[in-house]
C-alpha cells in the first residue's frame, strides 16, 4: 500500500465498538464503554473522573452465560470514586440492576433503578443531561450500542 493511502486508512479507522464510543443524541454527548471485570471497571471509573464536566452515568450489568453468572467481582470495583460533585446521577440497569443498586448503597451513593436500558437512556436524555456515560458489561454491549445508534 502506498503511503498516501495508508495515511487515509489510518484517518478513517474507527476502533471503537463500545470502547469509549461516542454518540451525539439531541443535546447529549454519550460515551459507551465496556467494563467486564474489576480492572476494566476501575479503568472506566478513572476515565469518567478525568472528565471534569458534570455528567450522568448509567451502569448496565447482566449475568448471561457469556458474562459469567458470578457477579461477585462488583465488590472489587472502587465505585466510591463516583461520590463526586461532577456526577449528577447514577442509574443502574440490566438483568442484575438490583445487585448493582445494592453495591452502590454500600458506598453510600444513591442510584436510580431502571431495569430497561432503553428507558434508562431515554430518561437521562429527557432530564437534560449534557454528558452521559454508559458503562456496560459484555452481553449488554451490543444491545446498548444498537439502542444508541438508533437514537443517534
Located regions from the model:
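Gly/charged, well-structured mid-domain segments that form the phosphate/adenylate-handling core
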Residues: 1-31, 35
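Residues at or immediately preceding the N-termini of alpha-helices
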Residues: 3, 38, 117-118
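Generic C-terminus detector
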Residues: 98-106, 110-152
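Short loop/turn motifs at secondary-structure junctions
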Residues: 2, 53-54, 86, 128-130
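Active-site beta-alpha connecting loops in nucleotide-dependent enzymes
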Residues: 16, 28, 34-113, 151
Amino acid at each position: 500500500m502506498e503511503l498516501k493511502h495508508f495515511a487515509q486508512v489510518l484517518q478513517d479507522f474507527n476502533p471503537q465498538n463500545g470502547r469509549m464510543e461516542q454518540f451525539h443524541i439531541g443535546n447529549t454527548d454519550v460515551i459507551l464503554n465496556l467494563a467486564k471485570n474489576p480492572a476494566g471497571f476501575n479503568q472506566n471509573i478513572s476515565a469518567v473522573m478525568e472528565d471534569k464536566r458534570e455528567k450522568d452515568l448509567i451502569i448496565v450489568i447482566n449475568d448471561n452465560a457469556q458474562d459469567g453468572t458470578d457477579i461477585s467481582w462488583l465488590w472489587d470495583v472502587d465505585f466510591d470514586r463516583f461520590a463526586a460533585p461532577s456526577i449528577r446521577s447514577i442509574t443502574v440497569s440490566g438483568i442484575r440492576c438490583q445487585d448493582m443498586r445494592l453495591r452502590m448503597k454500600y458506598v453510600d451513593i444513591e442510584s436510580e433503578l431502571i431495569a430497561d436500558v432503553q428507558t434508562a437512556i431515554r430518561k437521562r436524555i429527557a432530564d437534560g443531561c449534557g454528558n452521559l456515560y454508559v458503562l456496560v458489561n459484555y452481553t449488554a454491549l451490543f444491545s446498548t450500542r444498537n439502542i444508541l445508534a438508533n437514537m443517534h
